[in-house]
Amino acid sequence: MLKLAWLQVAAWRSRRHHLDRRMPAGSMLQVASRLCGLHAQVLSSAVLTLWARVEELDRGAVQRALWKRRSLVKTWAMRGTLHLLPASELPLWHAALSTSDRYRKPAIWRRFGLTLGELDRLTEAIATALDGCVMTREELAQKVQELTGSRALAAKLAESSWGTILKPAAFTGNLCFGPSVGQRVRFTRPNSWVGITQQPSAEAATATVARRFLAAYGPATYHDLARWWGAGGIAGARRWLDMLGGDVSPVEVDGEPAWIITADVRKARDFEPIRSVRLLPAFDQYVIGASRHAEHLLPDNLRNRVYRSQGWISPVLLVNGFMRGIWRHEFKGNRLEVILAPFSTVPAGVRRAAEEEAERLATFLDRKLNLVWRP
């Protein structure tokens, strides 16, 4: 069995996340695909996730991909959180997400005053209403009332500002975000927005998702996969990896069991430690994927500086694949203030590299840099 140290894992995973060197300009969709989508609860963070990995990223590239080229799609996905997914891969994600039991638990819907039967009726009406249309929540509620004849169901949709009631439609491939009008969010149906090819079977889709997760976030455990996916629990994760058979292999990471793609075993074993400094934004995919074993990539007792209350994940100063500090940025007129707070004294070379990244960020955001180091 292959035995790895966390130093090797950090280097290997950084390479898989394109954090050792940036991808060429124009690689935005390839990076989004490799990361299994971009976490987009905060859209600006999704943009900076790409900035940290793609050379010469255009500041407006994500907006154009979403609303003009329609090559990225914003929808609810893993863990019920907002993601940007490559449009060409939506059939895969919808097929896998449709197996999730996350929103099939009656207790969730009792809080909304809905039964599962009423939820299914509402979800079906949403799918019909959005076919070929782009609607605000209010317009969607009105159309749902027309289709169902139920003012009560329409009211449930209109009165809730939360996305929970819309997520079953998103998981089954019947809803995604359309372009907003001012501050008003709008929704549409993926098959009419981007065109949907035939979905793979649920079994094939879940196996592919598990394989792609390990390719980007491995070596990983059943628990890592279960947390990242957000449904099905440990039993579901075990079932998914078992489906891969010989495509995955057991490894030990500093004595702890994990799994890796079999084709990656030799590459990971022989991979050299990297020299790389990056400013990762809030909710970066690298940090999200490490949430269960972050203590191996962080100094002792500093987990709560990165993984904060209410699910907030701080921007991270990443050094050679390890989390060595946090940072933030603020716009102040025509200046960008970047505040770097390393967890300990950093070597001069790391300091220079971090300053270069901050300068690169200021250029990307079209501001002059004001850099502040704090203990």
Where do the protein language model's features map onto the residues?
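Active-site-proximal binding-pocket segments
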Residues: 207-264
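Glycine-rich, small/acidic residue-mixed loop/short-helix segments
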Residues: 306-375
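Positively charged, polyanion-binding regions of nucleic-acid-associated proteins
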Residues: 115-134, 202-220, 239-240
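A short acidic, leucine-rich amphipathic alpha-helix
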Residues: 65, 137-145, 169, 222-227, ...
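Short, cationic-aromatic polyanion-contact patches
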Residues: 84-90, 181-200, 257-270
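Non-catalytic regulatory appendages
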Residues: 243, 247-302
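Phosphate-backbone binding and catalysis cores of DNA-processing enzymes
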Residues: 1-152, 300, 337
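A short, conserved structural fragment
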Residues: 67-77, 81-82, 171-180, 245-253, ...
